[in-house]
A protein has these predicted regions:
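Outer-membrane translocation/initiation segment of Type V secreted surface proteins
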Residues: 3-4, 377, 388, 405-574, ...
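Beta-strand-rich solenoid/repeat architectures in extracellular/passenger domains
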Residues: 37, 43-49, 53-62, 66-68, ...
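Gram-negative bacterial Sec-dependent N-terminal signal peptides
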Residues: 1-34, 612
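Glycine- and acidic/polar-rich repeat regions and solenoidal domains
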Residues: 147-156, 209-210, 214-223, 227-231, ...
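A generic tandem-repeat structural signature
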Residues: 84-132, 598-636
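Membrane translocator/pore-forming domains, dominated by Gram-negative outer-membrane beta-barrels
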Residues: 188, 224, 257-259, 269, ...
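Right-handed parallel beta-helix/beta-solenoid
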Residues: 54-59, 70-79, 91-103, 114-124, ...
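Extracellular beta-solenoid/beta-roll
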Residues: 37, 45, 49-51, 260, ...
């Protein structure tokens, strides 16, 4: 929004030219030389004497680069360019205009006093300075005003003076004997219209702009601030003082700034106590500007209304105190910094009311609410019913539709009954409030629910919740009924878990499984042999975990690449020592069967390790130690991505013994029982989520075991290659706990302690020294646990 186009920046040149022509060629009045002009013309240039001037009866004074003392003009015209005007004598102002006087000034400095715009006078300032400093004042002086717009007792109405203040600095100090109504004011208006534009800056020791409704004021006083700044010292940026019924129209636009020394952007009160009968109206519009401060209406002493509108991406960070009506729309925002009250609140499409910043909890009280698609933003310490929260209290009716967004202010999440009350409606509850985004605390998901009493609550469970009259029959909305026989209590619905909790659990499970492998995974099925071996192995696994609390469905996909090589052999090749490295990754999905929301978990990392084994004829013993580091991520719908790191030590001890059980043709069959123990020591960073939830691992270390039986055949192909198919059954017993604590409330995945696997595959060893083996397997467990895996390995002996 603009008050004026660029063509208005210096409209004074054409009138000036016309005035000069009229004065020099058409007027029969002679040119005056100094002091007083009565229907005459004078020019002051650099080096001319510094004098006071008094103009009457359509006189014209031109000051070009010169300096004067106080100038007073009635029904006359002034043009100042690169000039200086000093307040002199006992005058209160540097320039005083009355009647139909006009002042046009460019790059001029006014010292010691301001400009007085009386009656129907007009002022246009471009790139000027009005400077009133303490050293410019006389002892006992009470009046220091940059620009004053008022009326003179001797003049007749109408009083419709105008001032356009363009790219000008106004700096005003307090008077030695200050008065709130007359000292340290950048602008004081009792009539007319003032436009403050194009980077103008007002720095006032008291109030930046004072609009004063007196018994002699005009019915409407208008103030426009466009791309400019008003800064006050001890008072409000803008003050409206009401002593008689008046309408005040104030617009702040295009990146303007208001800085109130007392914390008020706008203060509406009275100056002299009782106000004359009748209502005053203050219309305060903020357009495409961001302001910080309060809007305060002294409704106890002033009769009327304060109507506030935010539009075109405007924002106010502050309190609204006794505001009659507020309209927030067009991508505009009101960020409350404390409790506020508004008569009628209209929240338009794209508008936002943020009830707080999360550092404290605020209450907004309104008489009527109308929603047209805007958003209410609440900060809530998500927990049980008693949780602290921002709150909207509607004393009257609520109509329309509005969105609700909830930010968790450090709540750990908890089970709710009736819920956390966000919106209290005293009248007709006809409005629809819809939760946008997600409200999550700890491991729980919260939902916005309308209760039977018409109020709106956050609940961590689905369903309508318990009947409040059953919980507490003494509530005011409950109608007494005859007692009935007691019935068994109804279990409240369980709280709703958020899917991110499942993603954390899935990541923990995946990391625990990343490095696990057996002797046969490295060795294949070969017996001990001379020589050094290098080997490589890839595998992929898909796991489906049991639903967490019958709500979260978890699926985990893992893959890894392992590389290793022997670095030494002993005992005639029966024993060998080697090193190995692992690169692994996991991708998990957690989906809520209740809400439909989902989250993804990812784990990426690697490990280095050493191994050693000894094998002779039918027996083998194997041991390994690995250390891994992993990067973890969790991404929920509509939530910020969470990142954290983990470290893992894992050691394994394994042994097996082979029994020959016969032949099928030329293939020898053997049966090998195996036993393996795995110890895991995992350290996961304590992570604080963006919403404040503290997440830590609980019980991700411990001892696990495997007992297996392997049926293997050994034969040779026509080309002389050794072929060894196998079939294996394994029983896995997990001793390590699996759990994640969300703000100290532990949630566990449904990973069965006992799992059972069947696998099959084959190994082929060629005469050239190459060998390859691979296989696939399936695993089952309680609670619907399922897993499928496939692997392929290559080795070379030299």
């Amino acid at each position: 929004m603009r008050f004026h186009t660029n063509d208005d920046r210096l409209p004074l040149m054409r009138p000036l030219a016309r005035s000069l022509l009229a004065a020099l060629f058409l007027s029969p009045i002679s040119v005056a030389l100094a002091g007083e002009l009565d229907g005459g013309f004078a020019r002051v240039s650099s080096g001319d004497p510094v004098e006071e001037w008094r103009l009457i009866n359509e006189s014209f004074l031109q000051v070009l680069g010169g300096e004067t003392n106080t100038i007073s003009a009635t029904d006359s015209e002034l043009y100042l360019e690169y000039a200086s005007v000093n307040r002199s004598g006992h005058n209160q102002h540097a320039v005083a205009l009355a009647g139909d006087a006009r002042l046009q000034a460019l790059s001029t400095t006014f010292r010691g006093g301001g400009i007085h715009v009386n009656d129907r006078a007009y002022v246009h300032l471009v790139d000027n300075q009005i400077l009133i400093a303490p050293e410019d004042m006389r002892p006992g002086e009470r009046l220091t005003i940059g620009i004053e717009m008022s009326y003179s007792a001797a003049s007749a109405p109408p009083f419709n003076g105008k001032a356009r203040i363009d790219s000008t600095l106004i700096r005003v100090a307090d008077a030695p004997d200050p008065r709130d109504i007359s000292s340290g004011l950048g602008l004081r208006m009792t009539h007319g219209q003032a436009d403050i534009v194009n980077g103008t800056r007002i720095e006032a020791a008291n109030v930046g702009a004072l609009l004063w409704g007196t018994r002699h004021a005009t019915p409407v006083i208008q103030l426009g601030i466009d791309g400019s700044t008003i800064q006050s010292g001890r008072g409000a940026a803008i003050r409206v003082a009401v002593d008689a019924p008046t309408q005040f129209d104030i617009t702040v636009a295009n990146g303007s700034q208001l800085e109130g020394g007392d914390g008020n952007l706008l203060l509406v009160n009275t100056e002299n106590g009782p106000v004359l009968p009748g209502d005053s109206t203050v219309n305060f519009t903020v357009d495409d500007s961001r302001l910080a401060g309060n809007v305060t209406f002294d409704a106890a002493n002033v009769s009327g209304s304060v109507n506030l509108a935010l539009r075109n991406k405007a924002q106010i960070d502050g309190r609204f105190i006794n505001v009659t009506s507020a309209s927030i729309d067009s991508d505009s925002t009101w960020l409350m910094t404390g409790d506020s009250n508004v008569g009628a609140l209209t929240l338009g499409a794209g508008g936002t009311v943020a009830l707080g910043s999360g550092s404290s909890f605020n209450t907004l009280t309104v008489d009527e609410f109308t929603g047209n698609g805007g958003t209410l933003l609440f900060n809530t310490h998500l927990g049980d019913d008693s949780s602290a929260t921002d709150k909207l209290v509607i004393n009257g009716d609520a109509n329309g539709q509005a969105n609700v967004r909830v930010l968790n202010a450090g709540g750990a999440g908890a089970k709710t009954d009736r819920g956390i009350e966000l919106i209290d409606i005293g009248g007709a509850s006809n409005a629809q409030f819809d939760l946008v985004g997600r409200a999550v605390g700890g491991q729980y998901e919260y939902f916005l629910v309308k209760d039977a009493n018409g109020n709106w609550y956050l609940r961590s469970q689905t369903g309508a919740g318990p009947d409040p009259c059953v919980v507490d029959p003494t509530l005011p909305e409950c109608t007494p009924i005859d007692p009935v026989d007691p019935v068994d209590p109804i279990e409240p619905p369980p709280p709703i878990l958020r899917p991110e909790a499942g993603a954390y659990l899935a990541n923990q499970f995946a990391m625990d499984q990343m490095l696990r492998h057996t002797y046969r995974d490295r060795q294949g099925g070969a017996a001990a042999a001379d020589g050094i071996r290098g080997w490589a192995r890839v595998d992929a696994t898909q796991s489906k975990l049991g639903a967490v609390d019958d709500q979260l469905d978890l699926r985990v996909d893992r893959s890894r690449l392992q590389l290793g090589a022997d670095i030494g052999v002993f005992d005639d090749g029966r024993g060998r020592i080697g090193v190995m490295g692992t690169a692994a990754r996991s991708s998990a999905t957690s989906r809520s069967d209740v809400t439909g929301f989902s989250a993804r978990g990812k784990v990426e990392g690697g490990a280095l390790g050493v191994y050693g084994n000894w094998a002779k004829d039918a027996m083998y013993v194997d041991a390994s130690v690995q250390r891994g580091q992993f990067r973890n991520r969790v991404q929920g719908e509509g939530l910020a991505e969470e990142r954290y790191d983990s470290d893992l030590w894992q050691s394994s001890l394994e042994a097996g013994y082979r029994f020959g059980i016969g032949h099928i043709g030329t293939t020898a069959l053997s049966l090998r029982p195996e036993l393996q123990l795995v110890y895991t020591d995992a350290k996961t960073d304590v992570h604080t989520e963006t919403n404040g939830t503290v997440v830590r691992a609980a019980g991700d270390s411990g001892l696990s075991g495997r007992a297996g039986l392997r049926l293997q055949g050994e034969g040779h192909s026509a080309e002389g290659a050794s072929v060894s198919p196998y079939l294996a059954a394994n029983w896995y017993r997990d001793g390590a706990g699996n759990g994640i604590a969300f703000d100290d409330e532990v949630l566990k995945a449904r990973i069965p302690r006992n799992r059972y696997e069947l696998s099959a595959g084959a190994r082929v060893e060629f005469r050239s020294g190459f060998s390859a083996w691979g296989g696939f397997g399936v695993m089952r467990g309680d609670s619907g646990y399922r897993e499928a895996t496939a692997n392929l390995s290559l080795a070379y002996k030299w």
